[in-house]
Amino acid sequence: MARSLKKGPFVDDHLMSKMEKLVASEQKQVVKTWSRRSTIFPQFIGHTIAVYDGRKHVPVYITEDMVGHKLGEFAPTRTYKGHLADDKKTRR
């Protein structure tokens, strides 16, 4: 179910304060965050946010198309290595 419009989009306070400081100082630093649930705001465009995937921080460069999506959508948590080849030896 979608979030109610009267509530507005969600962003963790610590992430928003870090991004506001970066925008004010006009620096381009990588911001580390564990907040995969935060929504991407328009003032994040052009910055890089390192989103935690459970193992490491994945750098995500924010573009205009990403606004309104969640940070976790761009840092996959599972690595798919493909199905194993059909081996005759393992079928015994």
UniProtKB/Swiss-Prot annotation:
Keywords linked to the UniProt accession: Ribonucleoprotein, Ribosomal protein, RNA-binding, rRNA-binding
Highest taxon listed in the record's lineage: Bacteria
Listed GO MF terms: rRNA binding; structural constituent of ribosome
PROSITE patterns documented for this protein: RIBOSOMAL_S19 (PS00323)
GO BP terms in the entry: ribosomal small subunit assembly; translation
A single cellular component GO annotation: cytoplasm
Pfam families linked: Ribosomal_S19 (PF00203)
Stated role: Protein S19 forms a complex with S13 that binds strongly to the 16S ribosomal RNA.
Protein family: Belongs to the universal ribosomal protein uS19 family.
Database matches in PANTHER family: RIBOSOMAL PROTEIN S19P FAMILY MEMBER, SMALL RIBOSOMAL SUBUNIT PROTEIN US19M
Name of the protein described by the UniProt record: Small ribosomal subunit protein uS19
Organism of origin: Bacillus cereus (strain ATCC 14579 / DSM 31 / CCUG 7414 / JCM 2152 / NBRC 15305 / NCIMB 9373 / NCTC 2599 / NRRL B-3711)
